[in-house]
């Protein structure tokens, strides 16, 4: 399978809106790494996904910020369950902080700590 086909197959499993948020969030992770604002694997950025399901994207546990891609981000629900398929897990501490904010602040599209 060519790289182009691999990218296309990854992309097709997400809606246009989710894919754009994934791209933007992965870029935010890379930018934070570029400026040295990350703390190894202990800093997190999450982005709320549109829709009634209350899902958000967060970084995979153990992955450095400069390694994160749109397709490696993990979609989770408010119970910490991974939504869809993922080869990765999430950091429980990061999930706890971000889910608490996303649960009560529906106007917050992104959380960084």
Question: What function would you assign to each model-found segment?
Answer:
Residues 22-112:
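An anion-binding catalytic pocket shared by soluble metabolic enzymes
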């Amino acid at each position: 399978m060519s790289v182009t086909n691999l990218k296309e197959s990854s992309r097709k499993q997400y809606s246009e809106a989710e894919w754009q948020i994934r791209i933007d969030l992965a870029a935010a992770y890379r930018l934070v790494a570029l400026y040295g604002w990350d703390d190894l694997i202990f800093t997190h950025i999450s982005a709320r996904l549109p829709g009634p399901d209350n899902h958000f994207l967060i970084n995979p546990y153990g992955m450095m910020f400069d390694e994160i891609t749109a397709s490696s981000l993990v979609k989770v629900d408010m119970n910490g369950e991974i939504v869809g398929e993922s080869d990765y897990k999430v950091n429980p501490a990061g999930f706890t902080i971000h889910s608490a904010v996303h649960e009560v602040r529906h106007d917050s599209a992104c959380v960084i700590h």
